[in-house]
Amino acid sequence: MARKAAGRYASALLAAIALAGCMGVPGATDPAPAHQRAQAVLSKWAGAVAAAGANAAVTPIGELTGQVGDWEEAVGDNNKRALMAGMVASATALSEEAPQDGEVTWQDGTTTKVPLLAAQQAIVAIENTTEAPCSDCSMLMVTDARLTSGPIQTTRGPATAPVWEFTVQDTAVKLTRVAIANPVVVAPDEVGSGLGLSIDSASGSVSGTELTVAFVGAPDPGNMPCGEDYTAEAVESDLAVVVIVTRHPHVTIGACSAVGARRTATATLAAPLGDRVVLDLQQGTPVPVVLAP
């Protein structure tokens, strides 16, 4: 369920490595397009919230579909590609009646109730999340469903949430789908690095106006060869915050080592963070936020 989040980190690391290998001063963030992009991200998120019917109390991050166990050699190639293509169907009738509201629990003990998908609705949700078509794949046939719980990542950090677990014909692997009904989701975008660095997490507090974001950048500060300093600026709406990270590189003659490092920068908000989500400027998707007590 964390496949996309991991992909985001890997992409950011590759971008940082590419920048580190450039000669001279790498291109800095272009402020006007970055602000336009931030407004577009906020608008897209508002549309997703409206489409979901409400500003959900729980917003999952990353993949909602997953698996328990590894595919057996005999079926692995087909089943992996079939799942990515959303080629999943129920071999027997599954319940179309939604269970009672479930509970999401965060690591600090905070809980909230959420409406849940019926088992058949979860199958349909998997079918509708096609990453890559597969014309020569055989369908994955589900024979049973069990409502359980499992770890998920949310805009408020790691949590335990209701999850549907599906038995599949001819394999011991179980398919899973986060059971939360109508989550707010947006498809990731890909834009140029000239609009700012991609962030992968944030930290702050509900009542605070300081928001620290984490990303992959140069290992050294800007007063050292090949080093960079970073500043962060928040672009805000009632529903979300987008953080623009601006690079301030050291003027360097020659090539720099192709090494990226975890860096942070802090933005000042115009209003306390509250229950707003934090969105990545590059992909337009939410990142996990660690909230101080």
What are these regions (language model features)?
Residues A2-T268, D280-P293:
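Long, terminal "pre-/pro-" and other extracytoplasmic accessory regions
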Residues A271-G274:
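Short proline/glycine-enriched turn/loop motifs at strand-loop junctions of beta-rich domains
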